[in-house]
Design a protein with these regions (language model features):
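HAD-like aspartate-dependent phosphatase fold
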Residues: 2-118
Length: 118
């Protein structure tokens, strides 16, 4: 059982217990799915999660994978390929590292900043 919280244009769905994605898949056009702990455990892919994503795509749902990795998205895609994730899933991978890099390149933090971390 998972706890689900979702947003659509018309309303916010409150936290609730969710037994299966099929209970809510028709509410949304796009699903943003975390990678670590959902799609993989760092060693192997989660076959049930892969099946769920395949079902979403078969029902014309968009899927975006999100990661808090401090690396560019292409590095995470390379890692997912090593885990044997199909290329058909890898066009929409977004990382916090990629978002930060774009923000820095667009000068969204000013001219001076201090980076602390990897």
């Amino acid at each position: 059982m998972a706890i689900f919280w979702g947003i659509n244009i018309r309303k916010t769905i409150k936290l609730r217990d969710l037994n299966h994605l099929s209970e809510i898949f028709h509410f949304y056009d796009t699903y943003i799915i975390d990678l670590w702990g959902v799609m993989h455990n760092g060693i192997s892919l989660n076959s049930k999660a892969i099946e769920a994503v395949e079902n979403l795509r078969a029902n014309s749902k968009k899927v975006v994978f999100l990661s808090n990795a401090p690396r560019p998205s292409f590095k995470v895609v390379e890692f997912l390929k090593r885990l044997k994730m199909s290329d058909k899933f890898l066009s929409q991978v977004i990382t916090s590292g990629e978002a930060a890099m774009h923000a820095i390149n667009e000068n969204k933090f000013g001219n001076k900043f201090y980076h602390l971390g990897p």
